[in-house]
Design a protein with these regions (language model features):
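Signature for the C-terminal beta-barrel architecture of outer-membrane proteins
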Residues: 70, 113, 133-305, 314-326, ...
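N-terminal periplasmic/intermembrane-space "pro-region" immediately following the signal or transit peptide
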Residues: 1-46
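Eukaryote-specific, low-hydrophobicity, charge-rich regions
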Residues: 28-54, 58-74
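Long, hydrophobic, well-ordered secondary-structure blocks that form the structural core
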Residues: 109-137
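Glycine-rich, histidine-containing beta strand-loop boundary motifs that form or position
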Residues: 75-77, 98-100, 107-111, 118, ...
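Extracellular/periplasm-exposed beta-strand and loop segments of Gram-negative cell-envelope proteins
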Residues: 50-51, 62, 140, 306-312
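Surface-exposed loop and membrane-interface regions of Gram-negative outer-membrane beta-barrel proteins
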Residues: 51-55, 67-100, 115-126, 256-257
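Structured alpha-helical segments in the cores of large, soluble enzyme domains
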Residues: 61-63, 96-99, 103-106, 228-237
Length: 337
């Protein structure tokens, strides 16, 4: 729509869903050791939504489309009911998107997930409430047609900026925290071939923007440490019949390079049978004890009491497997472990 294609002014209901669930656990939510966040059993990567005890009913509407050839909008309201809190309404996403030259510009709230992994993304996924942000992205990947960089093939760029909650000082109990700290990210995806994608990513919580952040010169003094970083790289390769992917990320920095590493690896088989009605995914992930915490920004790598990255948390390992059977015109049946 943003390039003038398609019908003008076609905002309409694109879909609706109802989620029925029942939750019974010892606590309403469990807490992490080194970050101010919480989690629930079997409820992850759900845009920060926590179920109430007992029966829950959640309905969502997906409305989107273009207002004209230069402006598209989207809104996803969510309506929930549980026996503890009764009725509740919230906004999963609400955004407007336009363009300037080769750049797409998005303003508003929209769920984003960067990196590879089905069970969770190490730096930034859909585990926490979506933030209101400004985002820039290339409308089409840039092609390196000739010259020394031709071997890179194509590249895409995504950049965003938002700010965190206004109660982070009070919730952490530390005067060194920062209310409404800036949260910024940049990701570059490089595609040397149609089968291979290589990604580079850096995300930062910023108390103050200065040259030291640009150079990666982190301070040893708590009074002068002004940011919390996660950065790293990932890749995906599409072989015939199987996709292989992995990522290696570092929590905070040492001498301009990420350290305190974590990783995930995975394999996806999109067609276990010739008709494509079955697929299989297997993943593994590991973090160390430094992940998602910070010695100055005590809330850690969180937003509204949820980890911004992988719900796995710090000092943890995970093995994940999922098999799905797709039913024609009905949906799918899945089993995960």
């Amino acid at each position: 729509y943003l390039q003038g294609a398609g019908k003008i002014n076609n905002v309409k209901l694109r879909g609706a869903s109802v989620d029925l669930s029942y939750l019974q656990q010892d606590s309403a939510a469990y807490k992490y050791n080194n970050a101010k966040a919480q989690w629930q059993l079997l409820n992850h990567n759900n845009n920060g939504y926590l179920y109430g005890d007992g029966f829950n009913a959640v309905g969502t509407l997906h409305i989107s489309g273009s207002l004209n050839k230069d402006l598209a909008v989207g809104i996803t309201p969510r309506f929930a009911w549980d026996k503890d809190e009764h009725g509740d309404a919230s906004l999963v996403e609400g955004y407007a998107k336009t363009h300037l030259g080769v750049w797409g510009i998005t303003a508003g709230r929209q769920p984003m997930s960067w990196g590879v992994g089905r069970a969770g993304q190490l730096a930034f996924g859909s585990n926490a409430t979506p933030q209101t942000a400004i985002k820039l992205n290339l409308l089409e990947p840039h092609t390196f047609d000739n010259g020394a960089l031709k071997f890179l093939g194509k590249a895409n760029v995504n950049v965003f900026a938002s700010r965190l909650e206004g109660n982070r000082v009070a919730s952490s109990g530390s005067a060194l925290e920062k209310n409404h700290a800036a949260f910024v990210g940049v990701r570059v995806d490089i595609m040397p071939t149609d089968a291979f994608t290589f990604g580079l990513e850096r995300m930062s919580m910023l108390k103050k923007f200065n040259k030291h952040w640009l150079l990666g010169d982190n301070a040893d003094d708590a009074e002068k440490d002004n940011w919390n970083d996660i950065a790293g790289l990932d890749f995906k390769y599409r072989f015939p019949g199987v996709q292989v992917y992995a990522s290696l990320y570092g929590e905070d920095q040492a001498h301009a390079f990420p350290c305190e590493n974590a990783y995930n690896v995975g394999m996806y088989f999109p067609q276990l049978v010739p008709d494509g009605s079955w697929d299989l995914r297997v993943e593994g992930a590991k973090t160390n004890d430094a992940w998602y915490g910070h010695w100055v920004l005590k809330n850690g790598w969180t937003y509204k009491d949820a980890i911004l990255g992988d719900w796995l948390g710090a000092d943890a390992k995970r093995v994940y497997a999922e098999v799905n059977h797709y039913l024609a015109d009905v949906g799918k049946l899945g089993l995960s472990y």
